[in-house]
């Protein structure tokens, strides 16, 4: 069914596609002995047109947030991830943008397109680290350039703290696993309008790290 939706993506509404993805995702999580604990769902803005900025631990991150989030969203992913089986179909169903970071013109066009769509009321997720951390729950530097979409769209920024998602695909274990997805309080435009993108990045990272420490993910 996922392949059919992916092959005929324009025949279905975003709500229909998202409902299917959640159903498949939760079935896969159950089969894989993975429990997703969602925190702060009430912090997700009621009005569409916002950006998620999570820390990046691995290939499972988007699937964890998909399980936890009741509101449809899409993704800006790097080219390498867009070629991963199953994730490729998931991203197609999400109408995600695949960014080739070596192609500056293409990357700029993606930023412009996503900014336009966020202004029109779509929600997007960007990994501000640019690549996944190889140090578990310890995030890398959040890059200021990742926040250009938010500043151009003047949209709410929702920091997301992921804990232990790296264990899902990257450790090879079949033991039961619990991962945490924390939706933190949004930063609205009035709060960050006078900040540089590097300052926004540092503040979002600070909030994410604080949450990881508070909930026992800091080892």
Which positions does each model-derived feature cover?
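Membrane-interfacial terminal anchoring regions of lipid-handling membrane enzymes
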Residues: 1-19, 36, 42-46, 198-219
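Catalytic core of membrane glycerolipid acyltransferases/transacylases, capturing the structured
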Residues: 2-8, 14-19, 30-32, 46-104
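Hydrophobic/aromatic ligand-binding patch that stacks against planar heteroaromatic rings
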Residues: 28, 64-65, 90, 116, ...
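Short gly/ser/thr-rich secondary-structure transition/capping motifs
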Residues: 31-39, 107-108, 163-165
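Generic preference for hydrophobic
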Residues: 38, 52, 75, 181-183
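Short acidic-hydrophobic, aromatic-tinged amphipathic segments that line or gate anion-handling sites
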Residues: 38, 97-100, 189
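Non-catalytic C-terminal accessory region of glycerolipid acyltransferases
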Residues: 108-219
